[in-house]
Amino acid sequence: MNPLPAQPTEYKGSEKLKGKSALITGGDSGIGRAVAMLYAKEGANVAISYLDEHDDAEVTKKAVEAEGVKCLLLPGDIKDAAHCRDLVQKTVDEFGKLNILVNNAAIQFVREDLEDISDEQFEETFQVNFFSQFYLTKAAVPHMQEGDSIISTSSINAYRGNPIFMDYSATKGAITAFTRSIAQSLAKRGIRANSVAPGPVWTPLIPSSFDEDGVEGFGQDTLMGRPGQPSEHAMPYVLLASDEGSYITGQAIHVNGGAWTSS
């Protein structure tokens, strides 16, 4: 895509996550890659889950390992519950622990009419975007300790809806409610759960979802007049994963360039 999404190459870490390990779904590109890079710069070992974008995943791996930490690449389909359990186990086996789970992977399809959404598309969108988060979170929690963190990528569309992403928006609403609920359930164990709700962000999903006019106008309706970059969305994931976010749980952090200004 042109221009390429901006990644946080100039960020200077301060060991906020030193000694921790993280599993990030959709970590091969976009927000997931930016989060992986920041976590590495803050001292965490990182496991990357992705479908089949092996070249992209290798780019992320190289960037992570350049920071002197480990990176584990874990390809496969997160629609499969057994694969999700395997992701968690392989992360624990490789790093000895799992402190941070970032449920980030998602798919979306432009459909202007409800009748155009097939049953198969609806089911797949929920399986990738939401069911995987249930599978992964359920598998991860037994390995997590007090102070550990679960972070899910929601969306501005969970709050305002979107007439061309009806099924996608519904999954993001489900993620928001699920995150708030598990935050309440896991508080007694000292495990925090939060979400980040991006607005328009310049990732590979955009040119694969929109036509040329849609890509050109993407993000122009925000107060900032442009889409956000992955590097601009990734910082809240560091806060929520670190001890500096120790009093934050059950919350959604909105990063949307002013596209949504209501509570």
Task: Locate predicted features.
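A conserved structural motif in NAD(P)-dependent oxidoreductases
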Residues: 222-233, 244
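Alpha-helical segment proximal to the catalytic Tyr-Lys
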Residues: 142-143, 184-188, 246
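Active-site helix of classical SDR
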Residues: 137, 171, 179
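Substrate-binding pocket helix/loop in short-chain dehydrogenase/reductase
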Residues: 112-114, 118-126, 218
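The beta1-alpha1 cofactor-binding region of Rossmann-like NAD(H)/NADP(H)-dependent oxidoreductases
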Residues: 54, 75-88, 119, 231-232
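Short C-terminal tail/terminal secondary-structure segment
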Residues: 8-9, 111, 160, 238, ...
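Residue(s) in the substrate-gating loop at a strand-loop-helix junction
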Residues: 155
